């Protein structure tokens, strides 16, 4: 019996066009350009999930450094002092303290200074 591939092709085209919904112009209407746009966007999203982690770590370090310097300690000395004091707060929490709880961060900085001297 002869097999016609119209159903499979239609399903595949529909899948890509559904994923391209919301794109502008031919990218949401034409199968080929929609497929290219979707494949590229999937590649970008995969890459950028990795990049996001790096970017947030950079942001946290930047915020901790700024707050530590306001309290008279550099970032590297601050982190080293925390290790000496046995305080195991991650950079995300430290950055949050630096932004939202300045007094508590200042207390941490004083503790670090005492451990470093």
UniProtKB/Swiss-Prot annotation:
GO molecular function terms noted in the UniProt entry: rRNA binding; structural constituent of ribosome
InterPro entries in the record: Ribosomal_bL20 (IPR005813), RIBOSOMAL_L20_CS (IPR049946), Ribosomal_protein_bL20_C (IPR035566)
Matches recorded under Pfam families: Ribosomal_L20
Record GO biological process: ribosomal large subunit assembly; translation
Gene3D superfamilies assigned to the protein according to its UniProt record, in alphabetical order: 6.10.160.10, Ribosomal protein L20
GO cellular component, one term: ribosome
CDD domains to which the protein is assigned, alphabetical: Ribosomal_L20 (cd07026)
Keywords: Ribonucleoprotein, Ribosomal protein, RNA-binding, rRNA-binding
Its job: Binds directly to 23S ribosomal RNA and is necessary for the in vitro assembly process of the 50S ribosomal subunit. It is not involved in the protein synthesizing functions of that subunit.
NCBIfam families: rplT_bact
Family: Belongs to the bacterial ribosomal protein bL20 family.
PANTHER family assigned to the protein according to its UniProt record, in alphabetical order: 39S RIBOSOMAL PROTEIN L20
Protein's name in the database: Large ribosomal subunit protein bL20
């Amino acid at each position: 019996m002869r097999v016609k591939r119209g159903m499979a092709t239609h399903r595949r085209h529909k899948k890509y066009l559904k994923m391209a919904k919301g794109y502008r112009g031919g990218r949401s209407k034409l199968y080929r350009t929609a497929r290219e746009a979707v494949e590229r966007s999937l590649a970008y999203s995969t890459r950028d999930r990795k990049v996001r982690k790096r970017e947030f770590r950079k942001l946290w370090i930047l915020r901790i450094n700024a707050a530590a310097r306001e309290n008279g300690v550099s970032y590297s000395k601050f982190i080293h002092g925390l290790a000496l004091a046995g305080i195991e707060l991650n950079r995300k929490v430290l950055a949050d303290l630096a932004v939202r709880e300045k007094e508590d961060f200042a207390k941490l900085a004083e503790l670090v200074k005492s451990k470093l001297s």
